[in-house]
Amino acid sequence: KVGTALSGEITVPFCPESELSGVQHTDFMYGVWYKRTVTVTEKQLKGRAVLHFGAVDYCAKVFVNGELAGTHKGGYVSFEFDVTALLKAGENEIAVYAEDNTRDRLIPSGKQSEQYNSYGCFYTRTTGIWQTVWLEFTPKAYISRVQYYQNITSGMVTVTAELVGTANLTAVSYTHLTL
């Protein structure tokens, strides 16, 4: 529920089992809640707002002002949600519920131990947010991804850009030869 206080604090991007999180939880966790308030200006709302997650282990449900922004499954892949329509000028609440039952054999657990003490690995279990999270404000149209492909034989580089939104785009091609 929006505005509900949580029982503790955690340093993100460290999982609650990590000493650096300030929690250092040693038992199994089925899931963990995160909540943060952010202030957004009218000017920032003129474009798009994209909420990025470096990684959350394993299933993340993301809420903005009590509304579901999206869900993501997978503990190692980055993901993002366009939260523009869910934000308002002023204070906004972002909440994340991360679910990761390491004892469920249907959920990939990597090298995490199913036993209380680590067995077969030298690190703690990982539940929840364990990579950086950031809220990015962009124009309505923006380049979300750029990739470069090189061909050593031909000496060519191909660049592809992924554009989000509608905009007039001019493509320019340059050729540079080295002898």
Residue spans of the language-model regions?
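Predominantly extracellular/luminal regions of secreted and cell-surface proteins
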Residues: K1-E9
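Ser/Thr- (and often Asn-) enriched beta-sheet segments in non-cytosolic proteins
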Residues: E9-T11, T37-T39, E80-D82, E91, ...
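Accessory beta-strand-rich segments of carbohydrate-active enzymes
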Residues: H25, M29-Y142, T166
